[in-house]
Amino acid sequence: MLRLNDVVLKDVVSYHSFFSKQAPGVKGPTIEKFLKRFEYNAPLDLYQVVDLEDFNLFFLDFFFKIFPKNLSIFDRQAANIVTANIIWSYRSWRHFKGLPCRGQRTWSNASSCYRSNLILRDYKKKNVRKIFGKYGGPEQKICFLCEYINYLWKSQWFSEWMHSRKWIKYTLKKKKVVFYLDLYATSKGLLGNLRSDAKGVTKKKKKMLTGHVGFDQGFTKIYLKAKYAVSKKVRRKLSLR
């Protein structure tokens, strides 16, 4: 047995058995593409578990993270974006990140990079429409950026995110208070100011953050619901703030 990432992989004696048991949907052509992209000359089944202590576990760890652990459609969707971006066009992924590939310049292989970006753009559009509905292109982009910035603050600056969340709840409890949320400014990272009595917040972040973050996931969908639930005549008079 092989233990990786605090998970015991049962009956895994080689990379080949790992593919057949832990990576559903991976067949021979996919394995050959990996071997070609990462320039592995030896077959995967030659690396046994007993030799993995001396062998670099990066390759196996890479597969274990990107492939889903079951046949759930949500895990499969999460893996599709990785397979489309790395497996199908590893060179394009390197060029997109501004990194050289096999000694080439970053400006080369433009056609494959263009095709890869088209596939990724269509994939993102489909996912955004599933989350936010059939909104226009600009609204989709704004919603996606607002959700991303809100999640970024929650994951990296949780104390500031919680302070903004408490400030929002405190403001909404007041009577005759209209809470304005500027989605355009939030999508550009212009988040305003915190209260001067904020504790545990640096001066730099006080100038960047107010009640524009601190929301639950999907807050933009609820915020835009009123805009797209009215008639066309009234909709023309409304605008995102």
UniProtKB/Swiss-Prot annotation:
Which Gene Ontology molecular-function terms are recorded? RNA binding; structural constituent of ribosome
Q: Which UniProt keywords apply?
A: Mitochondrion, Ribonucleoprotein, Ribosomal protein
- Primary site of residence: mitochondrion
Task: Report whether Iron shows up as a keyword of the record.
Answer: no
Query: Which N-terminal residues, if any, form the signal peptide?
Result: none
InterPro entries, per this entry? Rbsml_uS13_C, Ribosomal_uS13-like_H2TH, Ribosomal_uS13_CS
Q: Does the keyword Disulfide bond apply?
A: no
Highest taxon, organism lineage: Eukaryota
Under the cellular component aspect of Gene Ontology, which terms does the record hold? mitochondrion; ribonucleoprotein complex; ribosome
Task: Provide one Gene Ontology biological process annotation.
Answer: translation
Q: Where in the cell is it found?
A: Mitochondrion
Entry's family note? Belongs to the universal ribosomal protein uS13 family.
Protein name as annotated: Small ribosomal subunit protein uS13m
Query: What taxonomic classification does the UniProt entry list for its organism?
Result: Eukaryota, Sar, Alveolata, Ciliophora, Intramacronucleata
